[in-house]
Amino acid sequence: MIFRQLRRFLVFLLLIATIGLLLYQYIHFIKEPDLTEVPPPTALHPVVAEKKEELIALAAKKGINVVITQDFRSIEEQDALYEKGRTAEGNIVTHAKGGESYHNFGLAIDFALMSVDGQVIWDMNYDSNGNSKADWMEVVEIAKDLGFEWGGDWTQFKDYPHLQMDFGLTIWELQRGKRPPETE
């Protein structure tokens, strides 16, 4: 009986020691990249830039003029945008602070429509090509076919002009220096 208890205690100690050793190795030897080590992007990711141009061209073939209103956005620009409706005048337009948006990593664009006379149109029901389909949704369909995720599909904060390609990376991973490949 005493032998059994001693054996259980030793197995328990061995298990605790193993967990402790693994934790020690993880903390001291597995170092994730840090933003200080990986320079932040300064432009739109090449794949996103290419898909943006394809989106504009494919929409034009359907008689829809698309204008890109935002693409890469610096952390400072993001912080200023975040302040709108909070400490700066205007409506709240984002819940993402600097470094928390896919725009800050060159992985997102915002679009609008443009009329033939050059007016930027935010009307999601606008039908300039007269095919009885909302141009906005036609652009969204093209974008999704190209691999973009649409902010209008989000459940929390719908961002109808927003299109992004996250390449399976979270903001947390991007903040720690992970980057998508430069090509598809």
Could you tell me what each predicted segment is?
Residues 8-26:
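Hydrophobic membrane-insertion alpha-helices, especially the h-region
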Residues 82-92:
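Electropositive
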Residues 66-84, 160:
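Acidic helix-start/capping segments at beta-turn-to-alpha-helix junctions
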Residues 26-32:
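Signal peptide cleavage region of secreted peptide precursors
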Residues 4, 8-12, 88, 95-184:
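Catalytic cores and adjacent binding grooves of peptidoglycan-active enzymes
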Residues 32-70:
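Active-site acidic/histidine clusters and adjacent loop/turn architecture
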